[in-house]
Amino acid sequence: MRKFIIRNGNVCDGISDNIVKADVLVENGRIKDIAPDINSEDTIIFDASDRIVAPGFIDAHSHSELRKLTYPENRTKIMQGVTTEVDGHCGISSNCFAFDNDVFKWNSFAEYLELLKQCRPSTNSVFIVGHNDLRRSIMGGKPSVASDDEIKAMQKTFRELLEAGAAGFSSGLTYFPGKFADTREMQAIASILKGTEKIYTSHIRSEGDDLLNALDEALAIAEAGNGRFQFSHMKTMFQRNWHKLDAMLEKIDSAQKKGLDITADRYPYIYSATGLHQILPAPFDKNEKISDFLKESEENRKEVENALKNSPRDLKSTILINYNKTLGELAAEQNVSAEHVAMQCLMENNLQRAAYLAMSDANLQKIIDLPYVAAGSDGISSQLDNENDFVHPRAAGTFPLFFRMAAKTSGIADAIRKMTSLPAQIYRIPERGVLRKDYFADIVIFDADNFNSQAGFDGRNQFPSGIDKVFVNGRLAYDHTDPQNIGRHGEYIPIC
């Protein structure tokens, strides 16, 4: 299918406020014309009457770099209308460095890209270099600040990855080993961004009690680069910090007026999801191998269990994603404390995943309404049909929910802008995110009235309704009349 017409759709180009009735002609992977009543011989016709025709959605914050190899169909994203994912956030980008597990092995970013090409994922890929893996490639898991020589080595590696097409630099300063980095280290690495249009993105050092100081640090790091900052999953964690949103936005507004280019992404949920180790208070939050520590002695287990009484998180409402139950529910079933269940889970698995109820509905809507906030799932691709593959519902529900929340305030066209041209502009993704002549034909056809999430923590983590068809690089990737047949036409998009 190299030539086709999408007929009689309500075309929203992703950048303007207008939605117009028109046809879209696609040939050889690119948009050739957008106009009423296009005629072309020997052309397949797709009827889009009463449907929105929009640019394929761009997931501004994704973590699918490894799952694309094991699960290239990527149904959780393609069936939401996502055609491009920006991976490598929160300092996590093992694809950019030597990697070896039971399934895959590569020695460089170039080897990973060759493997990705062989796997043929359904979505396009843009990659960011993650600080945690960059640091680990030079320093291992060393729990200390970097030396001058180590910083120079990280700078050299980072520069090479930018030259290979990486879109920027990400950090996750609450995670290992990034949490051991000081601001000086981060600024030195970010300085390699100078002279490029590439961005610094961050899961900042604190999203709760020390939020405002953490934002100051992030802005200082961005300023040491090229003055561009993407605030990852912008939020205010824990009820005691919800009131800080206005002060946070004032800081951002002030920095923007001084010339910094600040944008953000957000998923439309008040539950976050990350490792269960995030419940650990000091000093145990510095121990990357907490599982081994707990296995060493009963004394260690009691010490951690007692410390968990001072956890910064609400343990009883914390959902263990692999069990699809809260710590409180599991504690009641076992007639023990939530702290005891949490300690046992940490002992069993350093990588236990959890979801935390810590955010405000009102703040969520206010953040999504900001003109510079793009849709970002913070999710991985998932099979969903695997009973052991539990994920946060944002993996399958972000885009329909974000669309509904954004459209409620600013209308359909602006909601689509935040899911298409805005993330394309943030990451400097060329010739995508807008329906325009000669641009790549990444296109979604959907029913705006019935575009709804069906994902939840209750086991109903299902695909959304309302998506009719998705095209990636001018080829059909998803058709709702044949949902099992996923076209795998995604490509790596280097950012120059």
What are these regions (language model features)?
Residues 12-23, 328, 353-364, 412-416, ...:
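Acidic, glycine-enriched loop/beta-strand segments at the rims
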Residues 292-297, 366-372, 377-380, 390-393, ...:
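C-terminal cap of metal-dependent C-N hydrolases
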Residues 1-5, 10-56, 71, 453:
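Histidine-rich, glycine-flanked metal-binding segment
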Residues 116, 122-133, 137-148, 154-175, ...:
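Active-site neighborhoods of metal-dependent hydrolases
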Residues 9, 24, 29, 50, ...:
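Divalent metal-coordination and catalytic microenvironments
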Residues 184-191, 199-226, 362-418, 423-425, ...:
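Extended hydrophobic/aromatic segments used for targeting, binding, or gating
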Residues 90-97, 101-224:
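Hydrophobic, small-residue-rich alpha-helical packing segments that form membrane-like cores
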Residues 48-107, 111:
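Metal-associated gating/positioning segment near the N- to mid-region
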